[in-house]
Amino acid sequence: MTLPLTIAAEAPGLAQRLGKTLATLPLSYRAQEKGASASVMLIAGDGDWAARATTAIDAGARGVIIADPGMTGADAILTLADRAEQAGAVVELAERYAGDPTLLRHHADLIQHLAATSTILMSQVGDFATPADAALDMVRTAHALGQPLTLTHMWQASHAVVVRGTAGEKLFEGMATSGSGGVGQRIDALGFGRTLRLALRGDGSASPSDLRIANAKGERKLSPVYESVDRAAWLRAHAALDRGEPDGQPLRQFAADVAMIQAL
């Protein structure tokens, strides 16, 4: 049975973003009526977002969507994971790159092909609050691709953040550049006789990203998914609430990624 859910944005600044997504969601999602409490809250992923999400759950929210989650206290994220599981609440991360619907659709296929590569290069263009936030975006994409990434170096050059590390036996290098033109994230995974080229849009639209796999037989473009990151997160939250299966493990992995970057 599909549960009817009322949804609301944490702050007026998110209302437009929520409204655009609500228009594409199933009718079981309804906008919050004046004076009524919301079943699911959309919370901005800046500042102390984990603490605010915990407060929302304490106030009775059955689900929370975090929009573009960034750096915050790792301990606060772990507290949120524990509280969500205790309350039976669902927390979904709407991540601009790691949550890309086309990437997630082809997750298993990409992991299989990445096993034959030895180097992962990542470049990112867009605004970021801090160098650590830029590094976090890249780390999260690597983990979304099933890569056990460990960063060893991070430094800031002119208008850019550079990170280096390893993903198992693979070498990893990423660079994030601040800018408004050509926003997105590009991943090139190189190996003997095999190449992956992924171009993730990261603009919040339903326009699909471009994912391609090349080997000795030629290049293959993976089928696109015409869906926004936000809509995909809302649908995952709804499905998890229907199943009654809250899972704090994704939050614990996010906390581990944050802690790794903070330790550099």
Identify the role of each PLM range:
Residues A15, I77, L103-L104, M138-V139, ...:
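A general structural signal for well-ordered alpha-helical segments in protein cores
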Residues I120-G193:
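Rossmann-like dinucleotide-binding domain that binds NAD(P)(H)
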